Design a protein with these regions (language model features):
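Long, low-complexity, charge-biased intrinsically disordered regions
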Residues: 1-281
């Protein structure tokens, strides 16, 4: 669901005045100003006031906010559970009881001007696949991969088979040293690419998390070797862009958390610090 003109729904905690809008100036009082009764687009308080208003309304309907993920709300009644996810003015509602979902939609429709976009299929660059017969749901960023590959002119590159070369030794001493190297790296979108890859890591591609983490350490002064490592990640993503996360039909397996960890003693060549890492899924 989408909230129409969401920022106009926020209440203001302070007095704010604005000049009369062009085309609507009072001819009898042209020097007077307008006092805002609600938030409008362009105010620095707009997004915050809208979020506060939505939070108040949805909690009034019985939803509880997740402490770890403030954009996630939950409402439970017996065995019926409803989840609501908010991203600015976009809303996803899910649950195991259709009438409960409809009641949430009806309530929100009374509070705000809403647009029902139907079953969620694509949100925040993530494609949602469903196989109801097998009780499977998949999350894919295929389109996002194509977008960043084209943006950084890697859409026709060779295909990679691993995100990072085995035993690749990246360190700060490999950063740009000479004026020529510095000028060369200024024209390389290193930080932008690393950030774009990080979004994929956060959403659907944990398989490139280690490579992204390693290359992100050299954003201040990257060198040619660092840039090559980043491009290798893009080549791997090009080859595996159709891979996606799948959540299956086995409740016991889905609710079980597996954790792995490892550590290395003084293995950072730059400062001889020890490193540790973990993954939970």
């Amino acid at each position: 669901m989408d909230v129409k003109t969401a920022f106009l729904n926020g209440y203001l905690d302070e007095d704010i005045y604005m000049v009369q809008p062009e085309g609507f100036v009072d001819p009898n009082h042209p020097r007077k100003v307008c006092k805002l009764q609600r938030s409008i687009y362009g105010l620095k308080q707009a997004s915050r006031s809208w979020n506060k208003r939505f939070d108040e309304e949805i909690k009034r309907f019985g939803f509880a906010q997740n402490l770890d993920e403030p954009c996630v709300y939950q409402k439970a009644s017996g065995s019926n559970v409803t989840f609501l996810i908010l991203y600015v003015d976009d809303i996803i509602i899910m649950g195991n009881h259709i009438p409960s979902l409809q009641s949430v939609k009806n309530y929100l429709g009374k509070c705000f001007s809403m647009k029902d976009l139907g079953e969620a299929a694509f949100i925040l660059g993530i494609k949602i696949y469903r196989d109801r017969s097998k009780q499977l749901i998949g999350l894919s960023q295929n389109a996002y991969m194509d977008k960043i590959l084209k943006r950084y002119k890697m859409d026709n590159s060779k295909r990679g088979y691993i995100p990072m070369q085995e035993r690749l030794d990246l360190n700060k001493s490999q950063g740009a040293q000479t004026p020529k190297e510095v000028n060369r790296m200024k024209n390389v979108p290193y930080a932008s690419v690393v950030g774009s890859i990080m979004y994929a890591v956060r959403c659907t591609r944990p398989d490139v998390a280690f490579a992204q983490n390693m290359t992100s350490r050299f954003q201040q002064n990257p060198g040619e070797l660092h840039w090559t490592a980043v491009k290798n990640i893009l080549k791997y993503l090009r080859n595996t862009k159709d891979m996606f996360l799948v959540y299956g039909e086995n409740p016991e397996a889905e609710l079980r958390v597996d954790c792995y960890c490892n550590a290395g003693f003084e293995i950072d060549i730059n400062d001889m610090k020890s490193l540790t890492g973990y993954v939970s899924f």
